[in-house]
Amino acid sequence: MSGKIGLYTGSFDPVTNGHMDMIKRASHLFEHVYVGIFNNPNKQSFFTFELRAQMLSEAVCALPNVTVVSAEHGLAVDLARELSVTHLIRGLRNTADFDYEIGLEYFNHRLAPDIETIYLMATHDLQPVSSSRIRELIAFRAPITGLVPQAVINQVEKMNENNKKN
């Protein structure tokens, strides 16, 4: 897809190996991929915005055509226009994701008809992985190895060490 620029967005609270799979696959399809980290106004964040951006940046650092951009507030289509993005990239794990994305795509297309949306299906073994499930595991200090990038594991270990000291 020469000349095509993608934008993959999320709250990444925290970034998971499911997200990373989407980002890596998109990096092979697009000349450049921006990963936009947003706050979800409907959710209470587990990690701070800055920490989520840091973990995500560390996780994608080996991908030369991927750039993390912070957009704490606003719409993905506004960021897409600002970055001259040609495609919004969305990941689908299941039919619930699909149903949600249909409504989102309708409004994205109304707001930015020149920006296409493409969907990537989650790899089968990563379909159950979600940030909310990872947060549950973290809260119970259950192992998250194999489910998240090393940057997240490092941060969780650091948090656990700090909690032991307090």
Swiss-Prot record:
Entry EC no(s): 2.7.7.3
Cellular localization per UniProt: Cytoplasm
Associated pathway: Cofactor biosynthesis; coenzyme A biosynthesis; CoA from (R)-pantothenate: step 4/5
Residues annotated to bind substrate: 11, 43, 76, 90
Superkingdom of the organism of origin: Bacteria
GO function terms (MF aspect): ATP binding; pantetheine-phosphate adenylyltransferase activity
GO CC terms in record: cytoplasm
Pfam families tied to this protein: CTP_transf_like
Chief location category: cytoplasm
Gene Ontology BP term (one): coenzyme A biosynthetic process
Cofactor(s) this protein cannot do without: Mg(2+)
Keywords (A to Z) from UniProt: ATP-binding, Coenzyme A biosynthesis, Cytoplasm, Magnesium, Nucleotide-binding, Nucleotidyltransferase, Transferase
InterPro entries from the UniProt entry: Cyt_trans-like, PPAT, Rossmann-like_a/b/a_fold
The reaction(s) this protein catalyses: (R)-4'-phosphopantetheine + ATP + H(+) = 3'-dephospho-CoA + diphosphate
Binding site for ATP: 11-12, 19, 91-93, 101, 126-132
Site residues (Transition state stabilizer), renumbered to this chain: 19
Family: Belongs to the bacterial CoaD family.
Function comment: Reversibly transfers an adenylyl group from ATP to 4'-phosphopantetheine, yielding dephospho-CoA (dPCoA) and pyrophosphate.
Quaternary structure, from the entry: Homohexamer.
Protein name from the UniProt record: Phosphopantetheine adenylyltransferase
Gene of this entry: coaD
